[in-house]
Design a protein with these regions (language model features):
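Short beta-strand elements
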Residues: 129-141
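Short coil-to-beta strand junction motifs in C2/discoidin
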Residues: 64-72, 132
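Short acidic/polar inter-strand loop motif in beta-rich domains
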Residues: 81-83, 120-128
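Short amphipathic, basic-aromatic surface patches that mediate peripheral association
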Residues: 53-64
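Bacterial N-terminal signal peptides that target proteins for export
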Residues: 1-8
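Short, compositionally biased P/S/T/A/G/V-rich stretches that sit at domain boundaries
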Residues: 23-45
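A glycine-anchored, Pro-Gly-centered beta-turn/N-cap motif
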Residues: 46, 70, 109-111
Length: 141
């Protein structure tokens, strides 16, 4: 008990954020996340392949604590910023690729759509600061 109190006191005195300890994995400063295809402004017919790019880090499966690695999440028509203290949502607009996929076959209804990648850590939290691609806009015919 004394040891636990000493560790807690030391953490509080040094300003270590205990609640966020397992969150906010740092990415290398030169890491760069991007959408290879489709290009910004593209018009696609029906379902299409979306290809993901990452430089300066590796792609791994969800749950892996491999250093300098994460897995892709594709945000579709999402305008709200992600909360870095919460896991990336998983729903029809926040697609998870936890098996380490670097491409996906996407089927969207006709119209204008935005796509953006976010790299998640082992527990689906965004990196700190968040590693996100440029948001692109496509037209689906």
């Amino acid at each position: 008990m004394k040891g636990t109190r000493a560790i807690l006191a030391a953490a509080l005195l040094t300003g270590l954020p205990l609640a966020a300890h397992s969150q906010g994995t740092r990415a290398p400063a030169d890491a760069f996340l991007y959408i290879i295809w489709p290009p910004d402004g593209a018009t696609v017919k029906g379902a299409f392949w979306c290809r993901f790019g990452l430089r300066g880090m590796g792609v791994t499966q969800a749950g892996s604590n491999a250093p300098n690695a994460g897995h892709h999440h594709l945000l579709i028509d999402v305008d709200e910023p992600l909360d870095p203290n919460e896991p990336i949502p998983q729903d029809k607009t926040h697609l998870h690729f936890g098996a380490g996929q670097t491409e996906a076959h996407i089927d969207l209804p006709p119209g204008k759509h935005t796509l953006q990648l976010v790299l998640g850590d082992a527990k689906h939290f965004p990196f700190n600061p968040p590693l996100v691609s440029k948001k692109i806009t496509i037209m689906v015919k």
